[in-house]
């Protein structure tokens, strides 16, 4: 068995990134337990992975600034790179991997720790290259964030034995921006988070409890996303104003997600245009509550500028909730005719779409069926089989030159 270390530096409240890594760990363990031994390496003592009652062996790695800088220099400083065999500080990350007899490391996102590996092969997930596409958003380009993101990808993507992403359109961009061979980039589609994927039976009492807990309105559109400029919350608030004033539809909006310093501005804007009573701001929501927030809504709306793929549409397909999604970056190649496409610059397009779906039950029914069919058409085992293919390919090549003592 190959010993795979899954490296985690993602917080639970990071939304889709955390849900995706949990799903990946669960599927890899379920499908390839006999061929891959999984251990977790985390830089946080608070992050304990417990999936379906199973706890994974977890090792804690915390590197201070000096230790990280040393690891970086060992790889990228020309002088240190030549001298490190003879004298220099050791690489704390590599030392731990050698101690644990790790064969391969999997980074579930673009982690700076991927730049610190010297001798251990690794796989990395790159969910998007939005910082190269939308330079106007501060969270991607200001305060040196663009340079930080681009440095990680430019140094790690070409060095990884494989890159995993979520759509062919992203694969093409990774190859173009970072000169990665397309044969080394694998596409594994998003899937619903485990809480939604495992949801089976609607419980009325639980639903009422959640309505009371969050003081939910009777009719609302749902947008689960961190509070960041590129998520386009302002657009949804404008849509609610149009729905209520132009179309006389008594509909609210429910947001949920972690605040990244932008929430107060969104709240202030909702007050300025007299929509405060129609906008409900929730924090990060626990997994068991999430399905009910979908099921009690009129629709999922995602006027985002990022991705272009995201997890919530797949969750809505599973729960048979209509999806409104930004018509950006050739996203139609991914979601096909399973979502109602909207112009993320024009709130009226979302307002008109919501009215159209509410008033046209047949159109809504067709949309729900197509979304659920698309979700069910994806061969999950085949897609995740690519991961085992990567592991076996690496082992096959190593067997041509490696001698077992």
PLM regions: where:
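Carbohydrate transferase catalytic cores enriched for Leloir-type hexosyltransferases
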Residues: 1-405
